[in-house]
Amino acid sequence: GYAVVLVDGSQEMCKAAAALCGQESVCSTFAEYAPQGSFDGIWACASLLHLSREVVRSVVKKLMASLQPGGCFYMSFKYGDFSGERNGRFFTDLTEVSLQDVLLGLNDVERVESRITLDVRPGRAAEKWLNVYLMKRR
């Protein structure tokens, strides 16, 4: 029984998520999203990778500000240095080094961990992901 806020920029995805979870969703881009209240945790699995690096930085800062002290923030990106259009969609890939640039200026982060994992989807075993775990200072 967790209370969650469903956020996506796609009307169709918002409808599907609301139907699946049985609650309303917020249809908003992450750049425009204005968190209401505060959160114990944020789960952004492959959610922010379609933003430019500059926008990722500002969104991460905004979302970190909405976390309770001691709150956790998970996000993932395709692993690499690429930024641009791929297969008709925009992607920002990150490495451990470019992640540090995204996190620059976040003074309320107590702990940062990252792990590289392989994609588990069929036919994509060679693709890598950068998984990032942040904890807000208590």
Model-derived features: where do they sit?
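Conserved S-adenosyl-L-methionine
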Residues: 108-120
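Class I SAM-dependent methyltransferase SAM/SAH-binding core
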Residues: 1-33
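A short acidic, Gly/Pro-enriched loop at the edge of an enzyme's catalytic core
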Residues: 31-42
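Conserved beta-strand signature within the Rossmann-like core of class I S-adenosyl-L-methionine
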Residues: 70-77
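Short alpha-helix
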Residues: 91-107
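Core SAM-dependent methyltransferase catalytic element
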Residues: 119-138
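A short SAM/SAH-binding and catalytic strip from SAM-dependent methyltransferases
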Residues: 40-55
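A short glycine-rich, Lys/Arg-flanked "PGG" loop and its adjoining helix->strand segment in the class I
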Residues: 57-69
